[in-house]
């Protein structure tokens, strides 16, 4: 087995004996004017081999971290630097399976879970019981498999989809896991993306999900995570991308007749454009600082509705460059250390900006276009 699979799946991200003292981010020199592709490759390859101890608290999210690394390498044109067979075997080991077909009616979700920490030996053979399938982990698992070119017809999609509908609530929202949890637009999006990637909508009631999404739209045109909540960049992305994946809104709403649209694209456009701050970056909510990840969350919404030409791209690029680390990767704010989450969405943002040498983006799925079926 390759070192990569061992490091991703190890019990510890780094030796616990290592000194874990706090340290302050280094003072950054003047930001580079160039997208440092080679440094980003080195950063992701380092993370692919060994996760630093700072990620110990995210042990439950190993699949998500792997998605950021492997999909990030694809954006950088380096998909072939991973052992696809080893990665596929590792990802597939996280799928839960029902004991029998009757088990599909027990209310559990048989998707993918995010970590070995939610598996437990249950018999003399050492087989593992999967008891923590999660919608977000399932999205990440399928995303990785698509990115490495794995045939999704080889997974037990029938059990996954039949059991996924157990998570949908009466109001159309989704729980992330069968033992309960928050219900909001994040998990509606995960469900829609899962159905889209598996090319089957048997796992959700689309009409009910659509109505829930529309109930989350605020007076200002944006969407909150739940009905009646403040408009938020991430929630707005989940709403618009879900509606697009489900086929309820088309391409380039602003250029087409919007009178028959189920949303008001002009009001949404205005809200999104107001999120670009004076420093060129995008904020997630009113009166919040600019943050690297919202260059994707808001930028992708504008791309989906046909309003991306109105982004001040030079200013956005300058902000993103200020968040580019000299070590590779991107930080949340200028001058901080990079992390995998903001690095990945930094790469997707630069793909939206059509940075030379990056793979094009499928904004609906947040994946490289070549990994997106039917787009």
Curated annotation (Swiss-Prot):
Enzyme Commission number: 2.5.1.59
Cellular component aspect of the GO annotation: CAAX-protein geranylgeranyltransferase complex
Reactions catalysed according to its record: geranylgeranyl diphosphate + L-cysteinyl-[protein] = S-geranylgeranyl-L-cysteinyl-[protein] + diphosphate
Cofactor descriptive note: Binds 1 zinc ion per subunit.
Organ and tissue specificity: Expressed in roots, leaves, stems, flowers and siliques.
Chain sites annotated for binding Zn(2+): 291, 293, 342
UniProt KW keywords: Acetylation, Magnesium, Metal-binding, Prenyltransferase, Repeat, Transferase, Zinc
Pfam families: Prenyltrans
Family membership noted in the UniProt record: Belongs to the protein prenyltransferase subunit beta family.
Protein name, as recorded: Geranylgeranyl transferase type-1 subunit beta
């Amino acid at each position: 087995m390759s070192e990569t699979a061992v490091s991703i799946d190890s019990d510890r991200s780094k030796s616990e004996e290592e000194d874990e003292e706090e340290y302050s981010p280094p003072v950054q020199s003047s930001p580079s004017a160039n997208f440092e592709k080679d440094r980003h490759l080195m950063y992701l390859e380092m993370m692919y081999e060994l996760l630093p101890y700072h990620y110990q608290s995210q042990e439950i999210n190993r699949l998500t971290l792997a998605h950021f690394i492997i999909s990030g390498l694809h954006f950088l044109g380096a998909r072939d630097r991973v052992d696809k067979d080893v990665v596929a075997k590792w990802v597939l080991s996280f799928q839960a399976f029902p004991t029998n077909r009757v088990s599909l009616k027990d209310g559990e979700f048989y998707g993918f879970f995010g970590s070995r920490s939610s598996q437990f030996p249950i018999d003399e053979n050492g087989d593992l019981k999967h008891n923590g399938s999660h919608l977000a982990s399932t999205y990440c698992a399928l995303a990785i498999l698509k990115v490495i070119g794995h045939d999704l017809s080889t997974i037990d999609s029938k059990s996954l989809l039949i059991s996924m509908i157990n998570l949908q609530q009466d109001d159309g929202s989704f729980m992330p896991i069968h033992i309960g949890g928050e219900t909001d637009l994040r998990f509606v999006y995960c469900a829609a993306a899962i159905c889209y990637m598996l090319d089957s909508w048997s796992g959700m009631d689309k009409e009910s999900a659509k109505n829930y999404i529309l109930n989350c739209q605020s007076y200002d045109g944006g969407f909150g995570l739940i009905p009646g909540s403040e408009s938020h960049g991430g929630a707005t992305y989940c709403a618009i991308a879900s509606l697009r994946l489900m086929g309820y809104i088309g391409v380039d709403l602003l250029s087409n007749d919007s009178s028959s649209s189920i949303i008001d694209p002009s009001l949404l456009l205005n809200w999104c454009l107001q999120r670009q701050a004076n420093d060129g970056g995008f904020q997630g909510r009113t009166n919040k600082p600019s943050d690297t990840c919202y260059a994707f969350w808001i930028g992708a919404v504008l791309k989906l509705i046909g309003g991306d030409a109105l982004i001040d791209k030079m200013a956005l690029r300058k902000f993103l460059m200020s968040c580019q680390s000299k070590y590779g990767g991107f930080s949340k704010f200028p001058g901080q250390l990079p992390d995998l989450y903001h690095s990945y969405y930094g790469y997707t943002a630069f793909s939206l900006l059509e940075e030379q040498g990056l793979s094009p983006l499928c904004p609906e799925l947040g994946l490289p276009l070549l990994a997106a079926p039917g787009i």
